[in-house]
């Protein structure tokens, strides 16, 4: 009963979009597709119309025709929920999954038959996930515990794949010089992807799913809490006081495609001595954001507003073309202050008359420290290289005053200082200041 009452809203959205393009189609379609190919096809029926068209002789038999049949699929799942376990506590959950693929096939038409020649599938995949078990694991430009775990996971995943294929691991002849099962070397994509995923999400390599695609999305969350205002000490000090925490992560596969060599002979080894994989993947990406890790938003009894927050995020990407891992890490610390001075007035003379202008003066100040760096890690050599990064101090001050309901003025001062992580870039300081006058026409 308590669980049912705390759930305020649940949303489920599933969208599937399919499309086909069949070039070389000759007959007239008739009014609204009532002739050919068929009325169900006009309304989205996605059965293999190309074979029916070939059987009925609807396709061109021009010798130099080389356009491709294309079939596209886009499947998107969105799940949302809003929970309120207590009056002062709100939790919002959100998870997503998206799968996109495009099948392209070269063909020719012979009398009464559609003849497929070469087919290739390309696509992208993204799903919300969770990496919080490794979020605070030691990692810098010199070393990374998760990266070392990734390298250690490869032998575990390789042995699981070999056992799944029925390879006798007790026979030394079935192992390569590094101790990996033959066909599942340390640089095989089928080995690298689960090992990478397990290491950076904190999962056990013995139990992680061996396939590249993940089935069910893990929700991101945003938590807001204002219950401290119930305490007498907080009531006496603050007009409002709230805490916010947010987290989200995602797992993505970019630019996967059909392995045409696998289609020819699935059991043949490639030049590196590995079994061929059904699909070839370019990059695997894990993205994590604490947005924010913690945020304090308060207003004191004297009208002073205070905001402080810490943000962290990281992006880990492995290139399966060269087996390099790229890690981007960001940290941001921000403090904001605001104060309103009420009813500041001064006299002005307008059109021969003395006019008293009275309005509030709003003051805002923000200061932030932001650090980020990008490291490329080599799986074969102990060689970590910082390729980009900087430490930045940011400051901003504004003061705005409304002279009337149409006219307002803003004074601003912006300051930034950046020191770069690589020696070829010089430190940079930027200062911007000025006055903005804004008039609104009714």
Model-derived regions: residue spans:
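Exposed, low-structure sequence patches enriched in small/polar residues
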Residues: 1-442
């Amino acid at each position: 009963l308590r669980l049912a009452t705390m759930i305020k809203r649940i949303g489920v959205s599933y969208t599937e979009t399919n499309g086909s393009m069949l070039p070389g189609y000759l007959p007239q379609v008739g009014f609204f597709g009532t002739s050919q190919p068929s009325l169900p096809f006009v309304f989205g029926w996605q059965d293999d119309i190309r074979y029916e068209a070939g059987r009925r002789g609807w396709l061109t038999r021009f010798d130099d025709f080389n356009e491709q049949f294309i079939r596209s699929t886009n499947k998107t799942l969105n799940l949302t929920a809003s929970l309120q376990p207590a009056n002062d506590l709100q939790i919002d959950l959100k998870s997503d999954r998206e799968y996109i693929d495009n099948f392209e096939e070269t063909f020719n038409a012979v009398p009464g038959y559609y003849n497929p020649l070469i087919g290739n599938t390309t696509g992208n995949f993204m799903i919300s996930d969770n990496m919080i078990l490794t979020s605070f694991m030691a990692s810098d430009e010199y070393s990374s515990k998760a990266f070392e775990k990734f390298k250690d996971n490869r032998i575990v995943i390789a042995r699981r794949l070999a056992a799944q294929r029925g390879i006798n691991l007790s026979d030394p002849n079935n192992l390569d010089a590094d101790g990996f099962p033959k066909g599942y070397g340390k640089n095989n994509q089928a080995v690298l992807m689960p090992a990478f995923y397990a290491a950076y999400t904190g999962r056990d390599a013995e139990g992680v799913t061996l396939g590249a695609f993940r089935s069910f999305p893990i929700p991101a969350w945003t938590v807001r809490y204002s219950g401290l205002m119930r305490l007498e000490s907080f009531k006496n000090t603050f007009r409002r006081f709230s805490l916010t925490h947010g987290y989200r992560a995602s797992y993505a596969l970019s630019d996967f495609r059909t392995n045409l060599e696998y289609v020819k002979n699935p059991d043949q080894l490639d030049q590196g001595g590995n079994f061929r994989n059904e699909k070839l993947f370019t990059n695997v990406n894990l993205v994590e954001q604490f947005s924010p890790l913690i945020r304090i938003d308060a207003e004191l009894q004297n009208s002073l507003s205070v905001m402080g927050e810490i943000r962290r995020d990281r992006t880990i990407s492995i290139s399966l073309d060269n087996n390099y891992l790229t890690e981007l890490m960001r940290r941001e610390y921000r403090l904001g202050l605001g104060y309103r001075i009420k009813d500041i007035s001064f006299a002005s003379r307008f059109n021969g008359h003395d006019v008293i202008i009275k309005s509030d003066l709003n003051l805002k100040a923000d200061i932030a420290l932001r650090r980020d760096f990008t490291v490329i890690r080599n799986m074969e050599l102990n060689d970590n290289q910082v390729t980009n990064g900087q430490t930045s101090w940011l400051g901003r001050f504004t003061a705005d005053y409304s002279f009337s309901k149409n006219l307002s003025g803003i004074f601003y001062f912006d300051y930034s200082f950046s020191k770069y992580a690589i020696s070829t870039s010089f430190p940079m300081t930027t200062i911007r200041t000025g006055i903005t006058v804004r008039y609104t026409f009714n």
